[in-house]
């Protein structure tokens, strides 16, 4: 029974994160519309609130294209795996209700974020383009350098909280 409640809580958390991202993109489009002295997205529904869902429907119904010489499976799996990793990181966040409470949440966070590097590298490699591979390697180098500084800042906070 506890496993089912944990699974339902995790699914509810993922759905809430995805909906909040959709409305943050709507907020971004509204702010950009006001900055550029136009109304922004307001054609769908009441004040454009269903606009992110209409954008998602439009995105999923578009034709899928891929480079001819690419590795088809890894070309499509790597962004999906990256999305799952970013949603999986939310499982270690402490909440008022104990969803998945474990002691090594900080280490789990660092491990999940470091796995995201591989998805970028595989996405660049699987397109069989030298330019995409170089762009993927640059993104990997940048991500690794950011992760090192993030880990050092996290360890510093942990060290000062123990004193």
Swiss-Prot record:
Keywords of this entry: Electron transport, Membrane, Mitochondrion, Mitochondrion inner membrane, NAD, Respiratory chain, Translocase, Transmembrane, Transmembrane helix, Transport, Ubiquinone
EC number(s) from the headed UniProt entry: 7.1.1.2
GO BP annotations, alphabetical order: aerobic respiration
Membrane topology of the entry: Multi-pass membrane protein
Gene Ontology MF terms in the entry: NADH dehydrogenase (ubiquinone) activity
Function: Core subunit of the mitochondrial membrane respiratory chain NADH dehydrogenase (Complex I) that is believed to belong to the minimal assembly required for catalysis. Complex I functions in the transfer of electrons from NADH to the respiratory chain. The immediate electron acceptor for the enzyme is believed to be ubiquinone.
The protein, known as: NADH-ubiquinone oxidoreductase chain 1
Native species: Drosophila guanche
């Amino acid at each position: 029974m506890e496993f089912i409640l944990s699974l339902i809580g995790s699914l509810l958390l993922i759905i809430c994160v995805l909906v909040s991202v959709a409305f943050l993109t709507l907020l971004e489009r509204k702010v950009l519309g006001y900055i550029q002295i136009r109304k922004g997205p307001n054609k769908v529904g009441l004040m454009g609130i269903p606009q992110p869902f209409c954008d998602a429907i439009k995105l999923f119904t578009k034709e899928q294209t891929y480079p001819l010489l690419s590795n088809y499976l890894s070309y499509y799996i790597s962004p999906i795996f990256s999305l799952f990793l970013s949603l999986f990181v939310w499982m270690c966040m402490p909440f008022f209700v104990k969803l998945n409470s474990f002691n090594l949440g900080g280490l789990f966070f660092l491990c999940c974020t470091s796995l995201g590097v591989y998805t970028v590298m595989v996405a660049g490699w699987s397109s069989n383009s030298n330019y995409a591979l170089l762009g993927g390697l640059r993104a990997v180098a940048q991500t690794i350098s950011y992760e090192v500084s993030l880990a050092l800042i996290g360890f510093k906070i942990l060290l000062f909280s123990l004193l």
